[in-house]
């Protein structure tokens, strides 16, 4: 009987839509020296499992990393080995144990770090979602001195020293200020007519809203409502409501309908003081060029 129930559950999980959100919050750690060898770097990326995968090297070994603005810094895969939990971290589905590791040398394009602290997690479920080996995640502590351009039409990431003139790029369609909530860039917008604070998370394969907004957004502004599975870095699939929402508005710019999943973000608010209403993930980034300038604390969008 248990085998039958297990088979039914497995079949159900294959049929229902599944989403990965590689969001992680931990307390800030000490960082190493950063060397900027030039003013500009261009890095190709692959979209796998709804996430941005780039090539980087750690301690002389090159491999696949998820470029994740929802991650605090360098997060390395624990390779299924047990590790000593150094502290607690927060994800979209709850609290998880996080290990600590010394990264002797890290290289991503022009970005070079030495002797910096990284986080340690088992990311095997992300490997399954992406269909490839994943060495870890790259987040805020690596990116914070730069303007990072997500050029989806050309499948490339461009990294500039913050404040460098981008003379070859056209004037952006939209420029927005952002504030940092922990390590996450947060902008103000409206979703389904409701004013919300949205974190920009390039490690999320789907947009996320706190579940209270499912009822706050009028039914007329929601369509294709279904139950779907949402998995955070704690690797616990959570069944949530999902819907296409007619309008996401940033200032006077209205974006096309996008899909959102609705889940309880109370863990982030209550335990880590991350007061956000949701996350804009890959559905927001794709089909356009989006730049996050950490130095100027501005987001630029080209459509």
What are the functions of these language-model segments?
Residues 1-22:
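Bacterial Sec-dependent N-terminal signal peptides
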């Amino acid at each position: 009987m248990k085998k039958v129930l297990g088979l039914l559950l497995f079949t159900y999980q294959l049929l229902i839509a599944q989403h990965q959100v590689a969001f992680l919050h931990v307390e800030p750690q000490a960082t190493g020296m950063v060397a900027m060898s030039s003013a500009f770097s261009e890095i190709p990326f692959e979209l796998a499992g709804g996430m941005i995968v780039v090539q980087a090297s750690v301690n002389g070994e090159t491999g696949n990393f998820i470029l994740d603005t929802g991650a605090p810094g360098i997060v390395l895969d624990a390779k299924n080995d047990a590790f000593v939990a150094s502290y607690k971290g927060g994800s979209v589905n709850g609290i998880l144990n996080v290990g600590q590791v010394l990264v002797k040398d890290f290289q991503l394009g022009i970005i070079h770090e030495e002797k910096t602290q990284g986080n340690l997690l088992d990311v095997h479920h992300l490997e399954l979602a992406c269909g490839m080996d994943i060495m870890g995640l790259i987040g805020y502590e690596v990116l914070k001195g730069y303007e990072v351009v997500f050029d989806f039409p050309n499948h490339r990431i461009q990294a500039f020293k913050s404040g460098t003139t981008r003379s070859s790029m056209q004037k952006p369609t939209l420029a927005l200020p952002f504030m940092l909530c922990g390590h996450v860039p947060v902008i103000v917008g409206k979703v389904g007519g409701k004013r919300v604070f949205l974190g920009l998370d390039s490690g999320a394969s789907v947009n996320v809203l706190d579940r209270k907004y499912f009822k706050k957004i009028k039914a007329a502004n929601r369509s294709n409502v279904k139950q779907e599975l949402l998995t955070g870095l704690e690797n616990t699939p959570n069944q949530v409501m999902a819907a296409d929402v007619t309008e996401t508005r940033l200032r006077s710019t209205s974006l096309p309908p996008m899909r959102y999943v609705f889940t309880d973000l109370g863990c982030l608010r209550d335990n880590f003081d991350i007061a956000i209403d949701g996350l804009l993930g890959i559905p927001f980034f794709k089909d356009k060029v989006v730049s996050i300038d950490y130095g100027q604390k501005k987001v630029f969008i080209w459509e």
